């Protein structure tokens, strides 16, 4: 059976791994997933990720980040734009998520980026997910 929303599957795996206090989580790799992981790493929500090959299939292994107290660096990670209902936003309509403590991840004509970077470049796009 094929999956209809690979990004939502990745976000769910990350969320469940944090709830289970796992150190790593892996899932099938794709360009959009790796772009989202680049943003998460740049914003400091994950440690690192590595792309590996197994039986000619690419997998991404993500090293999750915890505080010294053992608390997860991601409290909430949710899909906003879904295959059945795409959500687009101009940059002026995006207000700070959790009083600028969280981020929106957007797919723009200039690539996948956080809302902070999109404000600097003054570009809107599809709101992929929100992270806090």
From Swiss-Prot:
One of its GO terms (biological process) is translation. It comes from the Bacteria. Pfam families: Ribosomal_S8. Keywords: Ribonucleoprotein, Ribosomal protein, RNA-binding, rRNA-binding. One of its GO terms (molecular function) is rRNA binding. One of its GO terms (cellular component) is ribonucleoprotein complex. Belongs to the universal ribosomal protein uS8 family. Part of the 30S ribosomal subunit. Contacts proteins S5 and S12. HAMAP family: Ribosomal_uS8_B. One of the primary rRNA binding proteins, it binds directly to 16S rRNA central domain where it helps coordinate assembly of the platform of the 30S subunit. NCBIfam families: PRK00136.1. This is Small ribosomal subunit protein uS8. The gene is rpsH.
């Amino acid at each position: 059976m094929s999956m209809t929303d690979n990004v939502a599957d990745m976000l769910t795996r990350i969320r469940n791994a944090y709830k289970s206090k796992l150190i790593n989580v892996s899932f099938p790799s794709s360009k959009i997933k790796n772009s989202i992981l680049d943003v998460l790493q740049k914003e400091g929500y994950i440690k690192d990720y590595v792309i590996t090959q197994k039986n000619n299939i690419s997998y991404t292994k993500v090293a999750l980040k915890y505080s010294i107290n053992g608390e997860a660096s991601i409290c909430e990670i949710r899909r906003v734009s879904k295959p059945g209902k795409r959500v687009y936003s101009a940059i002026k309509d995006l207000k700070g998520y959790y009083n600028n403590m969280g981020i929106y991840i957007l797919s723009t004509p200039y690539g996948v980026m956080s809302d902070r970077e999109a404000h600097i470049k003054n570009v809107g796009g599809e709101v992929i997910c929100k992270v806090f």
